Each structure stands twice: as structure tokens, then as C-alpha cells.
């Protein structure tokens, strides 16, 4: 295998070898490569035919640079680019045709991926211009800030890939992955730096905007003071998360708090939040999602207490996130990592047998078995678990919402369980940079000293730290805005994109019916100010 890869690297260094082979042989064969845009290539001619007459009558819009990498993002971005072109925007799609972000591929195969992407997207022209980042030959000199961004994002890339926070630079595999991410992110930064300066777009549109080259392009755009919009998807069909001039993975909700949380919560809003919470409590899917947030339905507070062997001492619940989830990266405040926070927290509570501690490992760990479990972190911190500390694994038949009900105090890093515990009127100590922190409904230490002092103060008089009626009402208000107004209507998620496209073809999306639902979102994607109906 190594000999074959070496030979392909040799061929890849020879001028025109990949191009000649592609033209005479490979382009006519069925693709066996994981990077496969054949389905997209077949679908685009009909899609362009739909958009072309609409675009001719559209009012000229913005100059949009759209960055996408990995074949699944490229598939979706091609159709989103066409939709924006149909609304009058001048769209350039800048692609980075990698199949994997964590593996090196021989130069010959990589050059042919560039050719495959070029052919697949050729039909977009002239509605959408396409450029491959790998065709650029950047020579930009990066600043210290750019280099610092590259190092930070490359470390996050490794944590995201390995699904653990500890990266051992003395371990050959960890180091090789980190070096690969440094190399690729450095190239992307230089290419983006020169390309953005030459294109001078009004706005850069980027998926995710936190990790991999997506994070790099976002950072470079902001460094150059170019507006950037980032987006991701939740579990609901026909919804999108959007952020303007911040990474969507940071979940900055300041703007929605300012604009919406001063408005009262109606009975209908309250009931809608309660319906969502009851679905999770009952281990039911909700709305247009197929995801179960809990795998066992509520068994009630008393039964849960009995199952865990809890007595009358106060209960402190620590709700964990999944390690390596990009929603947790870069969220540290006083702890170096969530692992360190959990380690020191359980060691503190090991000496506090005046209370009982329940650690809820995130049920989502079931979906990523390769991730280091928070249960493992606890066992490493406390090889002999005291009887007053209980670890509930991802697959254990305990419902998180029963734990919220029996908890007297909540501890959270970034999980939404912290918000939901506050909605129950319980004091919550927020220890990571999460969207509901600093809203007046959590206790927010900024150092280890403050954290331990807050624990001592709360545990000495738990009733005095219960949320008052006004705080609890705000928690429900905020929950409504976050769950129902923060997501925006959008036709095509990344997952199940082709199924969504069947339900919402371009002609339907750009019809009066489609625009009534999605036009505002398309406007927000090109950095028009957020509004609410």
C-alpha cells in the first residue's frame, strides 16, 4: 500500500499526468472514491434550468463568497448557491475537495478530486462561479494573529477527530494528526488571505466556522474585516442555525436576548416549551426530528431516588457534555478543559458526604462510542467511588429529566440541561462559556477560587439560592427564544440532504410558497439584519 501511495505521489508531481489520465480514462469510469459528486453532477443541469429564468429578473444583490469543503458540504452548497443566485446575488463557490480532514491522500488522487469537482460543478456557470482552493498558489505572509488562530483551530481539529481533550504531542499518532492539520490550515489561511483580498466579497458564507478549514476561512475573513455568516443544523428538519460575524458553534445569543427576551411569554409559548420538555421526559421524538434525546421515559422522582439509593441529603447533579463535540470546543473559562473541571469537581465532592452527587453522562455518548466517556474521566479521578457519588452512564435506564426534578443544585459546562435545571428554579453553577451563562439565571464563577467559593456558599444554604419567580420566568422566556426563535426556517439540512431536496426542490423553494417560508433566512445568510415575524 505504501509503495502504491509513493508511486501515486510521484505521478502527482509530474505535470499533466492526472489531467491526461482523467480525460482519457478515469472520468468515464464509475467512481470508487469516497469523494463522489456524481449524483450532484447529474442533478445540477435541471437545477440550473429552474434558476436561470428566475435569476434574469432578480434585483442585483450582494457579492457572496461561499466556502465549502468535504463532498457533503459541497453538495448542499451547490444548491444553496443556486438559490442565492436566483435571488440576484453574485455567488462564487470556493471549494476544498478533500474526502477526509484527518487523512493524507496521495497527490495524484487529490489532483483528480479537483478535476472531478470542476466537472461536477461546471453546470453552475454562469449563475455560480466556481474556484478550487487547491488551484490557488498562495504566497501570503501570515501575521502572528493568523498563526495563533491556526494553532488554536488545529488543536481543536485534533480534539474533534479523536473525541478527547487530551492531545499528547509526544505520541506519534497525535503529533502526526496535529501536524497535518497545521499544514492544511496554514495553506487554507494563506489561500483565503489572498483570495478574499482579491475578490473583495460583501459577505463570506461558511458552514460551521469553528473547526477545520471552515474555521480558518472564517477567522481570515474577520481579520480582513469582511462580514462572515456561519451556519449549522440542529436535529429538526427544515431548520438552520445562523450566526453573523461569529461562529455558529459559539451559539452567541446576545442579539436575541436584546431583541426578544424583554417581551412577555404568552401561555401559548409556555405550553410549547412544556410540550418539548415533556417529549424529552417521555423519551419521544418531537416536532420534525427523528432524534431521541432520552432513551428511557420518565419513571418519576421517587422511583429514580429508589433506583439510585438516594437518601434525604441534598442532591447535586453534574450534567456532562460529549467530549470532542464542536459545541464544547473553545468554551473553557477557568478550567483548562471539561475533563479537568469534572476531575476536580468530583474530587471536591468526594470529601463532601453531607450531600449526594449524581453525574449524568450525556446520552449522546451512545452515538459516538469512540469518544472518551465522562464516566471514564470520573473513574480516573476517583478509582474508588464513594457511596454518595453516583455515575449514570449513557445507556443506563435513567431519564435526565427525573434527575432535574430531584436535583437541589445543578452543575453544567455547556449542556442545555443547565438551562432546563434553572427552568425548574434550581441554582445552577455555569462553568463553561455557554449561551445561557450571564443571563441572571445561573451562578457564573470566573476562576477556580470563585468556583470553590460558590460551591461552599450554595451548599451552605441551598434554599437561599433558589431562583425567584422573575428569574424562573426569564429562564422559560429564554428557553422559548432559544428553541423556537433562534433556529430559522430552511429547506435542506446537511444530513439527508437529498431527501430534503426531494421535498423542497428548487422550483418550490423559489416559488411564492417557498419564499414565504425561507426568503428571510436567505437574506440573513447574506448578512441582512435579523428580524422576527
Residue ranges and their predicted role:
Residues 202, 213, 239, 396-443:
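A donor-sugar binding/catalytic signature common to diverse glycosyltransferases
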Residues 71-93, 97, 218, 337-350:
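Histidine-anchored nucleotide/phosphate-binding helix
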Residues 2-63, 83-186, 233-295, 496-500, ...:
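Conserved N-terminal ligand/cofactor-binding loop architecture of enzyme catalytic domains
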Residues 282-380:
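Conserved catalytic-core segment of nucleotide-activated headgroup transferases in glycan assembly
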Amino acid at each position: 500500500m505504501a509503495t502504491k501511495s509513493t508511486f501515486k505521489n510521484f505521478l502527482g508531481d509530474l505535470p499533466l499526468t492526472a489531467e491526461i489520465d482523467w480525460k482519457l480514462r478515469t472520468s468515464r469510469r464509475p467512481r470508487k472514491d469516497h469523494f463522489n459528486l456524481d449524483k450532484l453532477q447529474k442533478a445540477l443541469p435541471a437545477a440550473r434550468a429552474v434558476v436561470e429564468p428566475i435569476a434574469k429578473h432578480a434585483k442585483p444583490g450582494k457579492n457572496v463568497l461561499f466556502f465549502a469543503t468535504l463532498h457533503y458540504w459541497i453538495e448542499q452548497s451547490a444548491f444553496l448557491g443556486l438559490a442565492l443566485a436566483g435571488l440576484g446575488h453574485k455567488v462564487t463557490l470556493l471549494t476544498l475537495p478533500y474526502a477526509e480532514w484527518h487523512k493524507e491522500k496521495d497527490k495524484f488522487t487529490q489532483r483528480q478530486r479537483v478535476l472531478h469537482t470542476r466537472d461536477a460543478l461546471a453546470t453552475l456557470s454562469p449563475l455560480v462561479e466556481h474556484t478550487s482552493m487547491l488551484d490557488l498558489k498562495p504566497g501570503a505572509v501570515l501575521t502572528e494573529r493568523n498563526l495563533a488562530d491556526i494553532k488554536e483551530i488545529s488543536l481543536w481539529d485534533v480534539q474533534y477527530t479523536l473525541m478527547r481533550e487530551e492531545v499528547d504531542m509526544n505520541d506519534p499518532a497525535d503529533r502526526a494528526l496535529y501536524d497535518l492539520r497545521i499544514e492544511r490550515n496554514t495553506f487554507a489561511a494563506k489561500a483565503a488571505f489572498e483570495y478574499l483580498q482579491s475578490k473583495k466579497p460583501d459577505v463570506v458564507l461558511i458552514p460551521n466556522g469553528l473547526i477545520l478549514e471552515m474555521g480558518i476561512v472564517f477567522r481570515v475573513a474577520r481579520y480582513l474585516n469582511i462580514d462572515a455568516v456561519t451556519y449549522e443544523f440542529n436535529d429538526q428538519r427544515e431548520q438552520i442555525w445562523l450566526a453573523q460575524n461569529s461562529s455558529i458553534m459559539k451559539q452567541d445569543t446576545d442579539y436575541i436576548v436584546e431583541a426578544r427576551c424583554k417581551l412577555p411569554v404568552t401561555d401559548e409559548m409556555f405550553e410549547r416549551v412544556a410540550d418539548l420538555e415533556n417529549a424529552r421526559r417521555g423519551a419521544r421524538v418531537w416536532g420534525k426530528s427523528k432524534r431521541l434525546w432520552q432513551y428511557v421515559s420518565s419513571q418519576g422522582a421517587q422511583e429514580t431516588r429508589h433506583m439510585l439509593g438516594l437518601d434525604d441529603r441534598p442532591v447535586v447533579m453534574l450534567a456532562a457534555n460529549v467530549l470532542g463535540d464542536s459545541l464544547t470546543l473553545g468554551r473553557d473559562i477557568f478550567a483548562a478543559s471539561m475533563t479537568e473541571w469534572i476531575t476536580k469537581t468530583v474530587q471536591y465532592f468526594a470529601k463532601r458526604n453531607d450531600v449526594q452527587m449524581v453525574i449524568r453522562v450525556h446520552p449522546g455518548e451512545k452515538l459516538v462510542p469512540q469518544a472518551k466517556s465522562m464516566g471514564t474521566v470520573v473513574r480516573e479521578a476517583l478509582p474508588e467511588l464513594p457511596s454518595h457519588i453516583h455515575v449514570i452512564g449513557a445507556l443506563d435506564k435513567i431519564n435526565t429529566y427525573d434527575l432535574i426534578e430531584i436535583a437541589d443544585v445543578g452543575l453544567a459546562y455547556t449542556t442545555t440541561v443547565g438551562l432546563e435545571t434553572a427552568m425548574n428554579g434550581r441554582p445552577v453553577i455555569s462553568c463553561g462559556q455557554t449561551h445561557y451563562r450571564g443571563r441572571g439565571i445561573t451562578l457564573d464563577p470566573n476562576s477556580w477560587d470563585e468556583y470553590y467559593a460558590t460551591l461552599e456558599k450554595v451548599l451552605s444554604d441551598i434554599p437561599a439560592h433558589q431562583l425567584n419567580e422573575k428569574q424562573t420566568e426569564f429562564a422559560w422566556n429564554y428557553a422559548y427564544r432559544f428553541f423556537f426563535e433562534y433556529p430559522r426556517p430552511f429547506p435542506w439540512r446537511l444530513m439527508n440532504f437529498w431527501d430534503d431536496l426531494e421535498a423542497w426542490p428548487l422550483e418550490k423553494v423559489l416559488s411564492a410558497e417557498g419564499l414565504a417560508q425561507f426568503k428571510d433566512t436567505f437574506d440573513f445568510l447574506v448578512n441582512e439584519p435579523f428580524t422576527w415575524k
